Amino acid sequence: MKRIVFFLLNVFLLLFSVSAKAKEKKPVKPKFHKAFTEHFNKDSSKFFNLNGGRKRESKQMRYVPGTQSLCEKGTDIMLFRIDPKDPFGPGRGPEICSKDYTYYGSYSARIRIPDVREVQPNVGAVVGYFTYNMEKEKGLSEIDWEWLIADPEIVYIGTWTGKHNALQRIGRTINLAKGIVYECIYRSEADGNKNHKLTGLQNQPETVPAIKGFNAASQFYTYGFDWYPDRLVWWILHPETEEKIVLWDYKGSTPLFSGIPDNKTRYLLNFWHTNNWPVHTNPKSVEKPKYPYEVEIDWMSYKPFKEYNK
């Protein structure tokens, strides 16, 4: 009798163990985008989600896909419209985010930012074209282009890496109309967020050519970056010759960290109010937007580097 009870107990435990394992959730395999170009000429996107939703009943819609550009006849665009009632901070205004992950590859977009200098020269607003993903183990993966719209001659490029409370930044600030590199720096929270100059191989090219008449608000420009495991290259296409002008060819590392993200990410573009980050040339430019300013996006593209994404 004892043998029978012992046998049945073992069978029960075995079945319970199998059942428990069956109920365990299998890890979800992340999905990655293949190469694509989104022209935003349809009501919905195959590649991007609209964060924050759309208000079709409102006269001040955040997102208007497939509408005509105000500055370039015959070009259909995605229009972002900021709401003056939006609170400050990234992600509080219109934003699109890729449905799946992206990784090492070539990214580019054709964008025109709003022209506000005659209307509100001290406005504090940011257009961000970037990648972003925070993971517990590897930390942040962010590569960005940013424009503080109070001065459309200036661009900000760089990365954020590191974990929560230990973030790390490399960045370059450039006046493309004048060909001036205002700064090329790195900093980290572990070091008190003090800016340190990047020199030598981390500061290439040391100078950039001026693009005559450059004004990110007056017309569309094509901006891009190429992301490799050991290198990042930010570039712009010359509006007349379509020559690729390299603005920063970053290789290697800072004394404290690499500065090059090494984990998967998402692909985004957003428009938001800042109350504490003025543009380099105007310390007063942190005002809340007074009007529903608009960003025009012609297209966004992604081409993965298959040899690195294995």
Range-by-range predicted roles:
Residues 1-4:
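Positively charged n-region of N-terminal signal peptides that target proteins for export
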Residues 8-15:
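Bacterial N-terminal signal peptides
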Residues 18-21:
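Sec/Tat signal peptide C-region and signal peptidase I cleavage site
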Residues 23-310:
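GH16 jelly-roll
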